[in-house]
């Protein structure tokens, strides 16, 4: 059993925010792999899905970003899922737009959702870092992540979420390097291998 968590803020007001790309990716997995309907559980919206040979719970916390760990810890305890089998998909300022990296453990890089999960559950979970780029000035970060993706960004956002969903069985199987490589190749094949500016193909 895996616990796959997308981070974001609940409600229509935040649905298109850059901070909510984790929700978007989990929604793409749910659609593509015919998950059960999401229902309110564990202080979030949860669905069941089979990815390859692995059963997984998809979770979108309803606690707002800064309290994400409450929902994650509740679901993790209920299903007795080892921390190494908890996978968190989140926005990453320090990666270029349309890039993806997977890592286990490590720092939180100022991400309040990760900080909350680490405080509640521990640090040794897997993170799928979904690059959104950086606005260039630390003072602009708050507004940047809580603004919607621009119209020019939406094509790569949709392609990245689709690629994550396409190869989610590798992620569930623990084949992180293969998953990361497949997503990279898929994005390169769609022309997103070198996004110089937000939304722009090279």
From Swiss-Prot:
Record-annotated site: Stabilizes the basic form of H active site to accept a proton: 91
Catalytic activity: an N-acyl-L-alpha-aminoacyl-tRNA + H2O = an N-acyl-L-amino acid + a tRNA + H(+)
Site label Discriminates between blocked and unblocked aminoacyl-tRNA, positions: 9
GO biological process: protein quality control for misfolded or incompletely synthesized proteins; rescue of stalled ribosome
Matches recorded under PROSITE patterns: PEPT_TRNA_HYDROL_1, PEPT_TRNA_HYDROL_2
Main function: Hydrolyzes ribosome-free peptidyl-tRNAs (with 1 or more amino acids incorporated), which drop off the ribosome during protein synthesis, or as a result of ribosome stalling.
Protein name: Peptidyl-tRNA hydrolase
Organism: Methylobacterium radiotolerans (strain ATCC 27329 / DSM 1819 / JCM 2831 / NBRC 15690 / NCIMB 10815 / 0-1)
Lineage: Bacteria, Pseudomonadati, Pseudomonadota, Alphaproteobacteria, Hyphomicrobiales
